[in-house]
């Protein structure tokens, strides 16, 4: 399983970090885990979901 941060998820999906954070607030994306520092981590399914929503 790949673990993506918000910035890496945005980069791989070709969208801005602001779009990813907006989708988080709207409930379209959810992190699968959090780092000890509180950063959300996303999996490959989240990347696919983000690409699907953007299409």
UniProtKB/Swiss-Prot annotation:
PROSITE patterns: HTH_MERR_2 (PS50937). It holds the Pfam family MerR_1. Residues 3-55 form the HTH merR-type domain. Keywords: DNA-binding, Mercuric resistance, Plasmid, Transcription, Transcription regulation. One of its GO terms (biological process) is negative regulation of DNA-templated transcription. SMART domains: HTH_MERR. Residues 6-25 bind DNA. Gene3D superfamilies: 1.10.1660.10. GO terms for molecular function: DNA binding. This is HTH-type transcriptional regulator MerD. The lineage of its organism: Bacteria, Pseudomonadati, Pseudomonadota, Gammaproteobacteria, Pseudomonadales.
